């Protein structure tokens, strides 16, 4: 990997942040202000070196035409965890959960630090569509036995049936609320939490 100076690292990070936030790169003046360089020619010099090292591409005919490149050698290897897909769970009426591991999915470790804390379930039904969870989606679930009001959870009823709903603890009962305005909530006296939905994976056919 080609080395860059601390100032060039700062410039590259600022360009990435601006593109991420605004959708377009900053001007030379904005770069200079961000990293403490008063001279535009000095900024141009750093940009030229970043371009020579393969980190950016510029179009000299346009004032903001800076394209961020990600050369293979500059990409830090991402830590991956393998999360088990343990079957299907309803997003409609509760059904008995299928808990056989079908396959493992590689996911970035931003979802968790220990593989045994996460699992995935395939959604059946349309009761969570207004939360963006569709029939056939795979939800990423962090194992936990408690939930806060409003969390989307995998809930197990007293009949050992599983469902994905938004959780609410209310006086004398629990409300498992669908995210579909045409469906009624499920009211139960007892419920156990299998985990909280923390992410979503969707196959595109």
Swiss-Prot record:
The record marks 91-92 as: Cleavage. CDD domains: HTH_ARSR, S24_LexA-like. Keywords: Autocatalytic cleavage, DNA damage, DNA repair, DNA replication, DNA-binding, Hydrolase, Repressor, SOS response, Transcription, Transcription regulation. Gene3D superfamilies: Umud Fragment, subunit A, Winged helix-like DNA-binding domain superfamily/Winged helix DNA-binding domain. Pfam families: LexA_DNA_bind, Peptidase_S24. One of its GO terms (molecular function) is DNA binding. The keyword Transcription regulation applies. It catalyses: Hydrolysis of Ala-|-Gly bond in repressor LexA. Residues 28-48 bind DNA. GO terms for biological process: DNA repair; DNA replication; negative regulation of DNA-templated transcription; proteolysis; SOS response. This is LexA repressor. It comes from Lysinibacillus sphaericus (strain C3-41). The gene is lexA.
């Amino acid at each position: 990997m080609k080395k860059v100076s601390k100032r060039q690292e700062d410039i590259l990070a600022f360009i990435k942040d601006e593109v991420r936030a605004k959708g377009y790169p900053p001007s030379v003046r904005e770069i200079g202000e961000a990293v403490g360089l008063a001279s535009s020619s000095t900024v141009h010099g750093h940009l030229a070196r970043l371009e020579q090292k393969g980190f950016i591409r510029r179009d000299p005919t346009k004032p903001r035409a800076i394209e961020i490149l990600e050369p293979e050698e500059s990409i830090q290897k991402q830590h991956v965890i393998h999360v088990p897909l343990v079957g299907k769970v309803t997003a409609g009426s509760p059904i008995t959960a299928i808990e056989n591991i079908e396959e493992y999915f590689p996911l970035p470790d931003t979802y968790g630090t220990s593989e045994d804390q996460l699992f995935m379930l395939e959604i059946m039904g349309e009761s969570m569509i207004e939360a963006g969870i569709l029939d056939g989606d795979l939800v990423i679930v962090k194992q936990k036995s408690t939930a806060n009001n409003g969390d989307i959870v995998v809930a197990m009823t007293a009949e050992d049936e599983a469902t994905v709903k938004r959780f609410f603890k209310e006086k004398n009962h629990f409300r498992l609320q669908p995210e579909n305005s045409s469906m009624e909530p499920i009211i139960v006296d007892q419920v156990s939490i299998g985990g909280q939905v923390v992410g979503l994976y969707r196959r595109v056919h």
